[in-house]
Amino acid sequence: MNTTPSAHETIHEVIVIGSGPAGYTAALYAARAQLTPLVFEGTSFGGALMTTTEVENYPGFRNGITGPELMDDMREQALRFGAELRTEDVESVSLRGPIKSVVTAEGQTYQARAVILAMGTSVRYLQIPGEQELLGRGVSACATCDGSFFRGQDIAVIGGGDSAMEEALFLTRFARSVTLVHRRDEFRASKIMLGRARNNDKIKFITNHTVVAVNGYTTVTGLRLRNTTTGEETTLVVTGVFVAIGHEPRSSLVSDVVDIDPDGYVLVKGRTTSTSMDGVFAAGDLVDRTYRQAITAAGSGCAAAIDAERWLAEHAGSKANETTEETGDVDSTDTTDWSTAMTDAKNAGVTIEVTDASFFADVLSSNKPVLVDFWATWCGPCKMVAPVLEEIASEQRNQLTVAKLDVDTNPEMAREFQVVSIPTMILFQGGQPVKRIVGAKGKAALLRDLSDVVPNLN
């Protein structure tokens, strides 16, 4: 693999790191101020809402909207006004001085006068034996991605907040039963969400218990529970477990550059979005330890863009000096949205579509290694990884074939290879599965994972 850094000479006015409501709103407002923001969405673009089933409390959507749909709309709106979006992950930053720089996982360096941090949060796991070992084999943090694999089965949800209730309610569409395990007697969830869960006959409750281990060898067979009052341990027999115990701020990228609190949240000055580093602003759940709502994240993204615009006008002599008025509609040369990502990849003709019927000929009998992407049209993270796989398929076509299998229309092979989480990518060599990768990853990370099996990837 070629990891030599490459610098781009253009100095941008604003770079936004992260997406979700905060990142996309910051991009929208910066674009309307004619700052032409460069946005690094990352491979988890769309943020936590990409795994949310239903958003009922975002103003303007009286009938609700799914998380991926809301993010799709926000992303397209930012594009429409001229934001430049890239799905690369940022690996390191240099934020001191008048010109800031970011380095992507692919070794590319980009520069800007101001930076907006909107990396959001990541899923908090239990950190117990068996959890990471069985991730993607019955352990999940995304009900919308993986719930359909547990039709007619007994599963568990761990947590006590709104997210746990939402996951449990969604999973009742597929599971025979859902047991909600919480370490306390009282729940943090809102009354309306808790009431819905209690009124669902498929949902059972176990309170005052912690999960001490996930049982299973190749797949989940149960949970080891400990009573927080008596200390007694029991086994709950389930085939799947969904973790919904909250999130942690993704601040490790800047933890040695800007001030953060003991829990990792980026600190801002007063009622602004300014961080301890001049010209660096922060927004969304990366900052907010109290409200953590889509609407508050969007609001702080707006504030960050306005703060950055004013700072540039005062300090950098940028385009922000030329206009602070809202602009009218503009044409964007890039209007791609997530709903077309899978179609675009397919039409490019580099990846191949395989089915249960063609699996033997296309995959198991291939002379070349074949990376099979198990995906579905409704899977948000699958849309994230689709263009990355298309790019790898094009660049590595001499060493590797990339194939896609829709688990909805071709469930047999998914069952055969115990795929219970998507996206799951399995590398086949000589007709045998030799590598399994669960979850959306960036190009550089995927190539690193594959290079120990397939040589000469670059």
From Swiss-Prot:
This is Bifunctional thioredoxin reductase/thioredoxin. In the pathogen M.leprae, thioredoxin reductase (TR) and thioredoxin (Trx) are encoded by a single gene. N-terminal part of the protein corresponds to TR and the C-terminal part to Trx. The keyword ATP-binding does not apply. It comes from Mycobacterium leprae (strain TN). Homodimer. CDD domains: TRX_family. GO terms for molecular function: thioredoxin-disulfide reductase (NADPH) activity. Signal peptide: none annotated. Pfam families: Pyr_redox_2 (PF07992), Thioredoxin (PF00085). The keyword rRNA-binding does not apply. Its main location: cytoplasm. Binds 1 FAD per subunit. In the N-terminal section; belongs to the class-II pyridine nucleotide-disulfide oxidoreductase family.
